Amino acid sequence: MRINPTTSGPGVSTLEEKILGRIAQIIGPVLDVAFPPGKMPNIYNALVVKGRDTVGQQINVTCEVQQLLGNNRVRAVAMSATDGLMRGMEVIDTGAPLSVPVGGATLGRIFNVLGEPVDNLGPVDTRTTSPIHRSAPAFIQLDTKLSIFETGIKVVDLLAPYRRGGKIGLFGGAGVGKTVLIMELINNIAKAHGGVSVFGGVGERTREGNDLYMEMKESGVINEENIAESKVALVYGQMNEPPGARMRVGLTALTMAEYFRDVNEQDVLLFIDNIFRFVQAGSEVSALLGRMPSAVGYQPTLSTEMGSLQERITSTKEGSITSIQAVYVPADDLTDPAPATTFAHLDATTVLSRGLAAKGIYPAVDPLDSTSTMLQPRIVGEEHYETAQRVKQTSQRYKELQDIIAILGLDELSEEDRLTVSRARKIERFLSQPFFVAEVFTGSPGKYVGLAETIRGFQLILSGELDGLPEQAFYLVGNIDEATAKAMNLEVESKLKK
């Protein structure tokens, strides 16, 4: 760890003692800076421009060196707006990459790309900082054992299980429950794994960032009374920020997550919303730096940039970073270079369905579209694999029969198909689950369902033992015992009504 060179504090050498350069050219967020001969900064060094603009306003802009141009000049990308900068202004080489605060003091706080708190709750109470550019863990440090990361969410654990230290793509439009699913995962990892979460908002709407913060406070994921008890750190570089900030904010969030993994030896959840915006920002910066564009106008370094981020997200012998990344697919074209490059790194996909959300089945995870490389008998065991396959087969058959049901009705189906439809409808409802973070909206207490309980429940439905129970008994319950208890209550209620 090193002291953050871009922030002043006791024991920090003042920036004035550092090497000075001068701005030679400004083109939007890109600065060319001239330095004295023999005193050139390294690639990725942080440069700071301090001074006053023409109306006397204080300027403090941090940039990152991207290219060494020759003739003692470097080209840097600004992390904030370059309004008010002028040629000839002094630029200070900090001598190190951007460094951000890490550790427990970051929990419950909101940061920008530079690691500065932006939540008006005062400075961060930590002296420990870490540079955002690091190499991925060496191969001998990796934990190569394939193990499932239990989330306590039935549909995820059974049909598209997450890998511990893996990368998951989260696909879904607006209003289908992405935010609530993310908050439930943050809550469950804290309770079941004693882990923490880091949320990186990359190039999305500022309103969404604000909504997420408010909902986290409401649901208790961020504890306002005792901020240290919070379970998540938030890092934002939203749509209104320059491309440099959007390109680097993912690394800022990842650096905070790496500290929890490597030093605190915890299981960490890293959320990136949206990974496409990371690629988009890299494309903008690449064009500004004058690089020749590649396919569809993307940067020629697309695979390298994506790899340098994704390779750092992994399990080591100390702890793990499991990453859930929202993926925007431009024009629904899965062959676009940005999503195609992302898919190469994913271990599982969780697809949220508007149709299920419209039926009121939450979480609205599509059991047929969601996939996972972990769903193999040698990894999850024969029992889990067989149960998952039978659930998918039953759901698929029900999907095929829906057109016939819509035209001719249930009565025209064969006895076997009627039984399949009945069980599939029970399965569909049993895949729903009350969430802890949604208690304040639904009034139903949240449920964490272990994997063994989940498998047992679906086996009982598939075996036909519960064919006599009504469908609504399976809706928004935890384990199968709650469904049978709910069925008895429904029976008592119907008798009382008579």
From Swiss-Prot:
Catalytic activity: ATP + H2O + 4 H(+)(in) = ADP + phosphate + 5 H(+)(out)
Pfam families: ATP-synt_ab, ATP-synt_ab_N, ATP-synt_VA_C
UniProt: ATP binding residues: 172-179
Gene3D superfamilies membership: 2.40.10.170, Bovine Mitochondrial F1-atpase, Atp Synthase Beta Chain, Chain D, domain 3, P-loop containing nucleotide triphosphate hydrolases
Enzyme Commission (EC) number: 7.1.2.2
Annotated keywords: ATP synthesis, ATP-binding, CF(1), Chloroplast, Hydrogen ion transport, Ion transport, Membrane, Nucleotide-binding, Plastid, Thylakoid, Translocase, Transport
Domain of life: Eukaryota
InterPro entries: AAA+_ATPase, ATP-synt_VA_C, ATP_synth_F1_bsu, ATPase_a/bsu_AS, ATPase_alpha/beta_chains, ATPase_F1/V1/A1_a/bsu_N, ATPase_F1/V1/A1_a/bsu_N_sf, ATPase_F1/V1/A1_a/bsu_nucl-bd
Subunit structure: F-type ATPases have 2 components, CF(1) - the catalytic core - and CF(0) - the membrane proton channel. CF(1) has five subunits: alpha(3), beta(3), gamma(1), delta(1), epsilon(1). CF(0) has four main subunits: a(1), b(1), b'(1) and c(9-12).
Task performed by this protein: Produces ATP from ADP in the presence of a proton gradient across the membrane. The catalytic sites are hosted primarily by the beta subunits.
Protein name: ATP synthase subunit beta, chloroplastic
Source organism of the structure: Chloranthus spicatus (Chulantree)
Gene that encodes it: atpB
